[in-house]
From Swiss-Prot:
A GO CC annotation given for this chain: cytoplasm
InterPro entries on file: Ribosomal_uS19, Ribosomal_uS19_bac-type, Ribosomal_uS19_CS, Ribosomal_uS19_SF
Keyword RNA-binding in annotation: yes
Protein species of origin: Thermomicrobium roseum (strain ATCC 27502 / DSM 5159 / P-2)
Protein name in the entry: Small ribosomal subunit protein uS19
Gene3D superfamilies: 30s Ribosomal Protein S19, Chain A (3.30.860.10)
A Pfam family that the UniProt record links to this protein: Ribosomal_S19
Region feature (Disordered): 73-94
SUPFAM superfamilies: Ribosomal protein S19
Disulfide bonds: none
This protein's encoding gene: rpsS
GO biological process terms held by the UniProt record: ribosomal small subunit assembly; translation
Length: 94
């Protein structure tokens, strides 16, 4: 179930403060965050945010199409390596 519409989108206060500071100075640098549940808001467009995937930070360049989505949607936590392949047989067939 999604978040109640009367509450509005969740925005991490620390991340919002960093974005506002970068927009004010006009600086462009990578921001590291663990806030995967933060909603992408219009002020973030054009910035690169490194979102933690549980192991490392994945850099994500924010575009207009991403506004309204969550940061965690763009940093997958699981790596799919495919289903089991036929392993070489280790025993000798008779």
């Amino acid at each position: 179930m999604g978040r109640s519409s009367k509450k509005g989108p969740y925005i991490d206060p620390k991340l919002k403060k960093k974005i506002d500071e970068l927009n004010r100075t006009g600086e462009r640098r990578v921001i590291r965050t663990w806030a995967r549940d933060c909603t992408i808001f219009p002020e973030m467009v054009g910035h690169t945010i490194a979102v933690h995937d549980g192991r490392r930070h994945v850099p994500i360049y924010i575009t207009e199409q991403m506004v309204g989505h969550k940061l965690g949607e763009f940093a997958p936590t699981r790596t799919y390596r495919g289903h089991g392949k036929d392993a070489e047989r280790t025993t000798r067939r008779r």
